[in-house]
């Protein structure tokens, strides 16, 4: 089989849905309590915080609804190309297609610490670095290494490592 398709999970995750529910519940509570408050300044501040929380929950709901960041990577060895398709905000799509001549290497970035980062990038001849892994929980190092070497062999590219 010469075509390999890999699904990428976008913003349609349980953690985002839980945060959206928490924000809309807490924001509505703040807003209603602010409206019922007998102290004008305290009520106005609570209404403001409630409005901000509800606005953020609407933004998060739309991000989940449109599944921003979701899509697929398609690796084709027969045509020697890679296709990257993602959903963007406002239901816009991002479609990138690179031939073997435009690909330079695969880059692995590993950053430990408070905000760990473990990602695989496609480096192009123009200098662009396109992420191939999904955003979210960083994958284990063994899985990242296996996936990167498999992709490098599949696409016949060199593998460049970087530890930050």
UniProtKB/Swiss-Prot annotation:
Membrane-traversing stretches: 14-34, 45-65
Per UniProt, which keywords does this protein have? Chloroplast, Membrane, Photosynthesis, Plastid, Thylakoid, Transmembrane, Transmembrane helix
Q: Which cellular components does GO assign to this protein? A: chloroplast thylakoid membrane; photosystem I
Localization annotation: Plastid, Chloroplast thylakoid membrane
The answer to whether UniProt assigns keyword Ion transport to this entry is: no
Which GO terms of type biological process are on file? photosynthesis
Q: How does the UniProt record describe the way this protein sits in the membrane? A: Multi-pass membrane protein
One Pfam family this chain carries? Ycf4
Instruction: Report which superkingdom the organism of origin falls in.
Output: Eukaryota
Family stated for the protein in its record: Belongs to the Ycf4 family.
Q: What does this protein do?
A: Seems to be required for the assembly of the photosystem I complex.
Name by which UniProt lists this protein: Photosystem I assembly protein Ycf4
